[in-house]
Amino acid sequence: MSSTLETLNLSHIPLPVHVALYRDVQNAPFLRQQLISGNADFEYAFIDASMVLSRSHALSAVFRAINDYLNQRLKSRNVHSETVFSFSPNNNIADSFRRFGISDSTKDLLVVKVSVTPDVTHESVAAHLAQSVEGTPVPFDDETLSGISDIAKIKKAYKLGALSSAPSDKADGTNGEDRRLELSVIGAIALRGAT
């Protein structure tokens, strides 16, 4: 499979981040087993893309994880498991993996790899993912994610059930609910553990 791997340089973060999005993944049980067994070749953040609202949502979790990594504040094994944990609005690591991480039934997968060593390059990550992920690569953008996101599951995970109660106030009939939801989940990521 070819990859639509994107390499990003986030503001204030010295490490490049490699991100790929896949649909119709056929080998999720294999990928999950590689993580569980601790296979160093599969040190990635494998995220169930149905739990990702937008590009900003994903990159907020990635930013938090890398920032915690750079400041020696990891609560999990490495920056990649910390990325999955960073999606969570609470401090329960196991719960974050259940809700946001890859499962045997995952069909849409967001893959994140942080270049924590010089040998992790765009080319090496692209080649490994092309060999390892049996799925259709798609662009990592808001349009694609909007077709994948399970809004009901996301609202439940972030306890935002009452968020949609505002009346429509725009000419096109929208009320900015999507933007409010995005800001709420990003706020939950930023504030986790602040109390």
From Swiss-Prot:
Q: Which UniProt keywords apply?
A: Activator, Chromosome, Nucleus, Telomere, Transcription, Transcription regulation, tRNA processing
Look up keyword Transcription regulation and say if it applies: yes
Gene Ontology biological process terms, A to Z: tRNA threonylcarbamoyladenosine modification
Q: Which Pfam families match?
A: CGI-121
Provide the coiled-coil residue spans: none
Q: Which GO terms describe its cellular component?
A: chromosome, telomeric region; cytosol; EKC/KEOPS complex; nucleus
Where is the protein localized?
Nucleus; Chromosome, Telomere
Query: Which family does this protein fall into?
Result: Belongs to the CGI121/TPRKB family.
The UniProt function text for this chain reads: Component of the EKC/KEOPS complex that is required for the formation of a threonylcarbamoyl group on adenosine at position 37 (t(6)A37) in tRNAs that read codons beginning with adenine. The complex is probably involved in the transfer of the threonylcarbamoyl moiety of threonylcarbamoyl-AMP (TC-AMP) to the n6 group of a37. Cgi121 acts as an allosteric effector that regulates the t(6)A activity of the complex. The EKC/KEOPS complex also promotes both telomere uncapping and telomere elongation. The complex is required for efficient recruitment of transcriptional coactivators.
- Tell me the subunit arrangement: Component of the EKC/KEOPS complex composed of at least bud32, cgi121, gon7, kae1 and pcc1; the whole complex dimerizes.
What name appears for this protein in its UniProt entry? EKC/KEOPS complex subunit cgi121
